[in-house]
Amino acid sequence: MTLPIIHDCDPGNDDALAILVAAGHAGLDLRAVTTGAGHLAFDRTARNGAIAVARTGRRDIPVASGAEGPLVRERLVAGVLDFDSALDPERPDLDAVSLDARHSSELIAEVVAAGEAATIVTTGPLTNLAMALQRRPDIAGRIARVVTLGGAWGLGNKTAAAEWNILCDPEAAAIVFGAGIPVTLIPVDGAAGAGITPSLIAGAEALGGPVGAFAAELLRSLVTTFRPGLFGPSHMPLNDPVAPLVAADPTLARIVPARVDVELAGRFTYGRTVIDFAGKSGLPANAEVVIGLDEARVHRALLDAIARLVK
């Protein structure tokens, strides 16, 4: 049995690596890749998503371009994209699949409505999914689960309070968390438990072929962006690829129920995910939250998924 998923993302090198994992994993059936504005403008994320899908060899997977910006707030500019290889800077030398004519939110809604209940894996802002739910409220009952990389129970990674993916569109995140859909949240604090190690990069390189070389290039480029923080991990977290891996196998993570709400009004805390593990609010839990990862198993699962794409 494979789990049907839609991968909504903002590629980005980390998202591109997650696309490779989602396409190659034996337990996943990747039905669509949808992109939108996030770390890069919407046209660049769509192009990068199309490149990543072409590299997998799975040209049957539709790739759509979506949200040009957030639902309400002005679009943020990441300001941290100092990658020196892979998809940043722009790579016109790499093959790309043709983009689907539909908007990402339309493609999400149509794929969900047409088939068995799908899991939505998100590794970027939640704008496309929120728009799909606004377009077609009926699809909420047909989404099996949302597995999303975003938020934090501690410090933010963009402001003192907020993590990037949620801060890019807090109103969209609030719509998703309030839609009554089962959610697995992978906060950056929890995702930090699986890092990009020299052995992981070597393992990708050892796979060989264009896919293995591309995966290794993506991993190396991500390491160049790492800036150690006072309380953060001592290595670059793997981040986005963890989302499809946990969707396929939740036993890779330690997961606990919690109440998750998104701050929409605070002067200093706008975009913060308020994760109530102890039930202090009196509100029912609305998410399963990843608080730890088995790094060795995550690494093996990632390499196994990419190995299935190597010709």
Regions found by a protein language model. Give the residues of each.
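A residue-level signal for conserved active-site and pocket-lining positions in enzyme catalytic cores
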Residues: 63, 176, 244
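Active-site histidine-anchored catalytic micro-motif
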Residues: 2-51, 92-193, 198
